[in-house]
């Protein structure tokens, strides 16, 4: 288990795109049987994020590190007054240590500071530990559908957290 010596930093450093993309590809394949499509989707989104960050558009990334190794990440993009939570992942050895909660709190705090209307996220039903974190943070599942984007059949979920009226 990861202890308090983990740090969370905001911003993109060389190697972060590759590390976050790799974590998604390896962990989702190992834990849920997803194929290369999830990794390709994360890579595409991370490149778009980097472009948005450098052009001054609304985007942010937090990375959890321990001993120089990336053990978690979460991102936010802003689209029309709505924050979209992206790339939330925590390495198995860092789970149940508070890292996930700290990452999620950082991302939601960013959206609140920007006075955004709500935070939206898309996930898959097999990620029950993540769903627990979302519920504790005040998110509600607003829809679900069966999809085949990442594998033969998965339940895809949309969650929202309303930040103001």
Protein language model regions, located:
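Flexible nucleotide-binding loop
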Residues: 97
């Amino acid at each position: 288990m990861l202890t308090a010596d983990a740090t969370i930093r905001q911003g993109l450093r060389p190697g972060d795109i590759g590390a976050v993309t790799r974590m998604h590809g390896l962990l989702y394949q190992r834990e849920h049987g997803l194929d290369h499509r999830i990794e390709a989707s994360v890579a595409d989104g991370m490149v778009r994020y980097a472009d948005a960050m450098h052009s001054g558009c609304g985007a942010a990334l937090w990375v959890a590190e321990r001993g120089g190794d990336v053990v978690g990440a979460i991102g936010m993009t802003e689209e029309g007054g709505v924050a979209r939570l992206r790339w939330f992942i925590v390495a198995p050895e860092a789970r149940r240590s508070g890292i996930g909660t700290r990452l999620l709190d950082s991302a939601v705090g960013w959206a609140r500071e920007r006075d955004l209307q709500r935070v939206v996220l898309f996930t898959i039903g097999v990620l029950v530990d993540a769903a627990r974190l979302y519920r504790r943070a005040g998110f509600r599942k607003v829809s679900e559908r069966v999809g085949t984007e990442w594998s033969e059949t998965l339940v895809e979920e949309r969650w929202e957290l309303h930040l103001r009226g």
